[in-house]
Amino acid sequence: MKKVLILVATVNLLFSCKKNDDNAGTFSGPDATIQQGKGKSWIKLGANGAPEQLGLTITDEALNSMPANGDESEVKLPLPAMAKSSTPFDHIEVGWNPHGHEPAGIYDKPHFDFHFYMVSEGEVAAATNTAKLNANPAADYLPQNYVPGPPVPQMGKHFIDVTSPELNGQPFSQTFIYGTYDAKVTFFEPMITLAFLKSNSNFERTIPQPAKFKKAGYYPTKMRIAKHDGVTDIVLDGFVLRQAI
């Protein structure tokens, strides 16, 4: 009987390890056309199935063909199922601003808004209620030194870090924004100039963290840019498990 129990325990352990191994690896979403190139989302999971990196990859053909004139444009990147089940994130929207945007003299450079949304595409489209656009979360759910900017319908209210270099006399190159709607954090947004993406092959920064999270899950603590093999990766990294408070 003892040998049988040991055999069963061994089989269960091997099955458990195989199950975790099946969850490990890098999983990609579908390709999307971005100007004359491509973009796609992806997630890297560790051996325990926990997220290690969540990102998007843009080809050099896309970066080199972004129009210098014309209107703003946006491309949606669906996340792979493994990303939606292992992180709070639902999809990514890549916004191109050929002339930048307000405030003048700060964010008026050609740049990308990389929205990592924690709500569905339908919820983003329905984010038009003025009261909900203007409703601020409790201070503990945003990082210190983050202050609200004007709300944008079908996005949300953008909170910016007052200690960021571009708000203290330095040129804008990259920054990290928190977005909210109905008093809840609904997106993370690395905002990065085209020039910075083209000129930096390896960049890493920390993501300011709030004291509390409304939804439990794995959240990133770093943002990275990496260029390799004719593509550029924009990566949320350093995921940490947070409890809801």
Question: Model regions: which residues?
Answer:
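Intrinsically disordered, flexible peripheral segments
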Residues: 34-38, 47-66, 122-123, 131-245
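Bacterial Sec-dependent N-terminal signal peptides
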Residues: 1-6, 11-34
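Histidine-centered catalytic micro-motifs
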Residues: 106-126
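Short N-terminal edge-element motif at the start of the domain
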Residues: 32-35, 47-110
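Short beta-strand element of the conserved SAM-dependent methyltransferase core
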Residues: 17, 114-118, 238-243
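Plant-biased detector of terminal regions, especially N-terminal secretory signal peptides
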Residues: 20-23, 80-86, 212-213
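Generic marker of residues within folded, mature protein domains
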Residues: 7, 46, 104-106, 213-215
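Phosphate/adenylate-binding glycine loop and adjacent helical scaffold
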Residues: 43
